[in-house]
Protein backbone atom coordinates (compact mmCIF):
# COMPACT_ATOMS: atom_id res chain seq x y z
CA UNK A 1 0.00 0.00 0.00
CA UNK A 2 1.23 3.48 -0.84
CA UNK A 3 2.04 6.40 1.42
CA UNK A 4 -1.12 7.88 3.00
CA UNK A 5 -3.24 5.08 1.57
CA UNK A 6 -5.28 5.07 4.78
CA UNK A 7 -6.30 7.68 7.37
CA UNK A 8 -4.05 7.93 10.42
CA UNK A 9 -7.04 7.87 12.75
CA UNK A 10 -4.91 7.39 15.87
CA UNK A 11 -2.61 10.34 15.21
CA UNK A 12 -3.15 13.26 17.60
CA UNK A 13 -2.42 16.90 16.83
CA UNK A 14 -0.27 18.57 19.47
CA UNK A 15 -2.65 21.49 19.96
CA UNK A 16 -5.45 19.04 20.77
CA UNK A 17 -3.54 17.74 23.77
CA UNK A 18 -4.75 19.35 27.02
CA UNK A 19 -1.17 19.63 28.30
CA UNK A 20 0.38 21.15 25.17
CA UNK A 21 2.81 24.07 25.42
CA UNK A 22 0.68 27.18 26.00
CA UNK A 23 3.13 29.56 24.36
CA UNK A 24 3.29 27.45 21.21
CA UNK A 25 -0.50 27.18 21.24
CA UNK A 26 -0.95 30.95 21.45
CA UNK A 27 1.58 31.45 18.65
CA UNK A 28 -0.29 28.86 16.57
CA UNK A 29 -3.56 30.77 16.99
CA UNK A 30 -1.79 33.99 15.98
CA UNK A 31 -0.38 32.33 12.86
CA UNK A 32 -3.67 30.74 11.76
CA UNK A 33 -4.80 33.75 9.69
CA UNK A 34 -1.72 33.46 7.49
CA UNK A 35 -1.80 29.70 6.98
CA UNK A 36 -5.55 29.66 6.41
CA UNK A 37 -5.22 32.50 3.91
CA UNK A 38 -2.58 30.45 2.10
CA UNK A 39 -4.31 27.07 2.02
CA UNK A 40 -7.98 27.03 3.03
CA UNK A 41 -9.47 29.14 0.22
CA UNK A 42 -12.28 30.67 2.25
CA UNK A 43 -12.55 33.83 0.19
CA UNK A 44 -13.49 31.70 -2.79
CA UNK A 45 -15.98 29.74 -0.68
CA UNK A 46 -17.49 33.02 0.48
CA UNK A 47 -17.81 34.37 -3.07
CA UNK A 48 -19.14 31.19 -4.69
CA UNK A 49 -21.07 29.37 -1.97
CA UNK A 50 -21.96 31.76 0.86
CA UNK A 51 -22.58 35.20 -0.68
CA UNK A 52 -25.15 33.99 -3.24
CA UNK A 53 -27.24 32.65 -0.33
CA UNK A 54 -27.19 35.90 1.64
CA UNK A 55 -30.06 38.37 1.41
CA UNK A 56 -28.57 41.65 0.11
CA UNK A 57 -30.50 43.68 2.67
CA UNK A 58 -30.58 41.06 5.44
CA UNK A 59 -31.25 39.70 7.86
CA UNK A 60 -28.64 36.94 7.62
CA UNK A 61 -27.16 34.68 10.28
CA UNK A 62 -24.22 32.29 10.19
CA UNK A 63 -22.92 29.75 12.69
CA UNK A 64 -19.26 28.74 12.55
CA UNK A 65 -18.60 25.49 14.43
CA UNK A 66 -15.18 24.75 15.92
CA UNK A 67 -14.02 28.30 15.30
CA UNK A 68 -10.65 27.94 17.06
CA UNK A 69 -8.85 31.26 17.21
CA UNK A 70 -11.63 32.87 15.21
CA UNK A 71 -9.81 34.01 12.09
CA UNK A 72 -12.27 32.46 9.61
CA UNK A 73 -15.48 33.99 11.05
CA UNK A 74 -13.62 37.30 11.39
CA UNK A 75 -12.72 37.18 7.72
CA UNK A 76 -16.26 36.28 6.64
CA UNK A 77 -17.68 39.12 8.75
CA UNK A 78 -15.30 41.60 7.12
CA UNK A 79 -16.04 40.38 3.58
CA UNK A 80 -19.78 40.66 4.12
CA UNK A 81 -19.39 44.15 5.62
CA UNK A 82 -17.24 45.20 2.66
CA UNK A 83 -20.00 43.98 0.33
CA UNK A 84 -22.62 45.89 2.31
CA UNK A 85 -24.45 42.69 3.32
CA UNK A 86 -25.85 42.54 6.87
CA UNK A 87 -24.58 39.37 8.56
CA UNK A 88 -24.60 38.29 12.20
CA UNK A 89 -22.10 35.52 12.94
CA UNK A 90 -22.02 33.24 15.97
CA UNK A 91 -18.72 31.37 16.35
CA UNK A 92 -18.53 28.46 18.78
CA UNK A 93 -15.78 26.25 20.15
CA UNK A 94 -15.87 24.03 23.25
CA UNK A 95 -12.14 24.45 23.93
CA UNK A 96 -11.57 26.97 26.72
CA UNK A 97 -8.16 27.91 25.33
CA UNK A 98 -9.48 28.62 21.84
CA UNK A 99 -12.38 30.64 23.21
CA UNK A 100 -10.10 32.69 25.47
CA UNK A 101 -7.84 33.56 22.54
CA UNK A 102 -10.75 34.41 20.23
CA UNK A 103 -12.36 36.85 22.66
CA UNK A 104 -8.99 38.46 23.42
CA UNK A 105 -8.71 39.78 19.87
CA UNK A 106 -10.20 43.10 18.70
CA UNK A 107 -13.96 42.97 18.32
CA UNK A 108 -15.61 42.79 14.90
CA UNK A 109 -19.10 44.17 14.39
CA UNK A 110 -21.71 41.45 14.02
CA UNK A 111 -19.48 38.66 15.36
CA UNK A 112 -19.89 36.97 18.74
CA UNK A 113 -17.94 34.06 20.23
CA UNK A 114 -19.36 31.45 22.59
CA UNK A 115 -17.80 28.46 24.29
CA UNK A 116 -20.32 25.82 23.27
CA UNK A 117 -21.02 22.61 21.39
CA UNK A 118 -23.29 22.48 18.36
CA UNK A 119 -25.48 19.99 20.23
CA UNK A 120 -26.18 22.63 22.88
CA UNK A 121 -27.51 25.02 20.25
CA UNK A 122 -29.69 22.25 18.83
CA UNK A 123 -31.09 21.64 22.32
CA UNK A 124 -31.87 25.36 22.58
CA UNK A 125 -33.80 25.23 19.31
CA UNK A 126 -31.45 27.68 17.59
CA UNK A 127 -31.30 27.98 13.80
CA UNK A 128 -29.06 29.92 11.46
CA UNK A 129 -29.23 30.65 7.75
CA UNK A 130 -25.77 29.19 7.16
CA UNK A 131 -23.57 26.76 9.09
CA UNK A 132 -19.84 26.47 8.39
CA UNK A 133 -16.68 24.87 9.71
CA UNK A 134 -13.03 24.98 8.73
CA UNK A 135 -10.63 22.03 9.00
CA UNK A 136 -12.87 20.35 11.57
CA UNK A 137 -14.01 17.07 10.01
CA UNK A 138 -10.67 15.29 10.21
CA UNK A 139 -10.46 15.94 13.97
CA UNK A 140 -13.59 13.86 14.63
CA UNK A 141 -14.14 10.16 15.13
CA UNK A 142 -17.01 8.42 13.34
CA UNK A 143 -19.59 9.06 16.06
CA UNK A 144 -18.58 12.72 16.39
CA UNK A 145 -18.78 13.23 12.63
CA UNK A 146 -22.26 11.72 12.52
CA UNK A 147 -23.34 13.97 15.39
CA UNK A 148 -21.87 17.08 13.74
CA UNK A 149 -23.69 16.45 10.48
CA UNK A 150 -26.96 15.78 12.29
CA UNK A 151 -26.56 19.00 14.27
CA UNK A 152 -25.69 20.92 11.10
CA UNK A 153 -28.85 19.72 9.37
CA UNK A 154 -30.98 20.85 12.30
CA UNK A 155 -29.20 24.18 12.71
CA UNK A 156 -29.13 25.39 9.10
CA UNK A 157 -31.99 27.00 7.21
CA UNK A 158 -30.27 27.50 3.84
CA UNK A 159 -27.01 25.53 3.77
CA UNK A 160 -24.28 23.87 5.79
CA UNK A 161 -20.79 23.98 4.30
CA UNK A 162 -17.82 22.21 5.89
CA UNK A 163 -14.44 22.97 4.31
CA UNK A 164 -11.71 20.43 5.05
CA UNK A 165 -8.34 19.16 3.94
CA UNK A 166 -8.18 16.40 1.34
CA UNK A 167 -5.51 13.76 1.98
CA UNK A 168 -2.87 13.19 -0.67
CA UNK A 169 0.89 12.55 -0.80
CA UNK A 170 1.34 15.67 -2.93
CA UNK A 171 -0.43 17.83 -0.34
CA UNK A 172 1.72 16.32 2.39
CA UNK A 173 4.95 16.89 0.50
CA UNK A 174 4.17 20.46 -0.52
CA UNK A 175 3.01 21.44 2.96
CA UNK A 176 6.08 19.85 4.53
CA UNK A 177 8.49 21.73 2.27
CA UNK A 178 6.49 24.95 2.04
CA UNK A 179 6.17 25.46 5.78
CA UNK A 180 9.66 24.35 6.75
CA UNK A 181 11.24 27.86 6.83
CA UNK A 182 8.18 29.48 8.40
CA UNK A 183 5.96 29.29 11.51
CA UNK A 184 8.73 28.80 14.09
CA UNK A 185 7.75 28.09 17.67
CA UNK A 186 4.24 26.93 16.84
CA UNK A 187 2.36 23.75 16.01
CA UNK A 188 1.49 24.84 12.46
CA UNK A 189 3.86 22.58 10.55
CA UNK A 190 3.72 19.46 12.74
CA UNK A 191 -0.03 19.60 13.25
CA UNK A 192 -0.65 20.49 9.62
CA UNK A 193 1.12 17.31 8.54
CA UNK A 194 -0.83 15.31 11.12
CA UNK A 195 -4.04 16.90 9.81
CA UNK A 196 -3.27 15.73 6.30
CA UNK A 197 -2.59 12.20 7.58
CA UNK A 198 -5.91 12.21 9.48
CA UNK A 199 -7.99 13.74 6.69
CA UNK A 200 -10.30 11.98 4.24
CA UNK A 201 -10.02 11.55 0.53
CA UNK A 202 -13.08 12.77 -1.35
CA UNK A 203 -14.19 9.20 -2.06
CA UNK A 204 -13.80 8.16 1.57
CA UNK A 205 -15.89 11.08 2.76
CA UNK A 206 -18.57 10.54 0.14
CA UNK A 207 -18.98 6.93 1.24
CA UNK A 208 -19.75 7.75 4.87
CA UNK A 209 -21.88 10.90 4.80
CA UNK A 210 -25.66 10.61 5.21
CA UNK A 211 -28.11 11.11 2.32
CA UNK A 212 -28.59 14.75 1.42
CA UNK A 213 -24.93 15.67 1.80
CA UNK A 214 -22.69 16.21 -1.23
CA UNK A 215 -18.90 16.15 -1.40
CA UNK A 216 -17.14 18.28 -3.99
CA UNK A 217 -13.44 18.62 -4.70
CA UNK A 218 -11.95 22.06 -4.15
CA UNK A 219 -8.53 22.61 -5.64
CA UNK A 220 -5.82 22.19 -4.85
CA UNK A 221 -6.14 20.03 -1.72
CA UNK A 222 -9.52 20.57 -0.10
CA UNK A 223 -13.09 19.40 -0.41
CA UNK A 224 -16.44 20.86 0.58
CA UNK A 225 -19.14 18.88 2.34
CA UNK A 226 -22.45 20.61 1.66
CA UNK A 227 -26.05 20.19 2.77
CA UNK A 228 -29.07 22.10 1.47
CA UNK A 229 -32.47 21.57 3.11
CA UNK A 230 -34.96 20.31 0.54
CA UNK A 231 -37.24 23.28 1.09
CA UNK A 232 -34.33 25.59 0.17
CA UNK A 233 -32.61 23.46 -2.48
How should each PLM-predicted stretch be described?
Residues 132:
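A conserved beta-strand element that flanks and buttresses the S-adenosyl-L-methionine
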Residues 156-165:
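Conserved beta-strand signature within the Rossmann-like core of class I S-adenosyl-L-methionine
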Residues 198, 202-229:
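Conserved Class I S-adenosyl-L-methionine
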Amino acid sequence: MGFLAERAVDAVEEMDRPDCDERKLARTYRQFPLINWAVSGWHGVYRRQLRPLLRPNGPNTLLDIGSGGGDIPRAIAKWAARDGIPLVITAIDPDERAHAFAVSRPKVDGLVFHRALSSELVAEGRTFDLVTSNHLLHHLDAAQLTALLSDSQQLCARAAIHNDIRRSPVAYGLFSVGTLPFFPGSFIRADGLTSIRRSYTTHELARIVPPGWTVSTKRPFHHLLTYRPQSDA
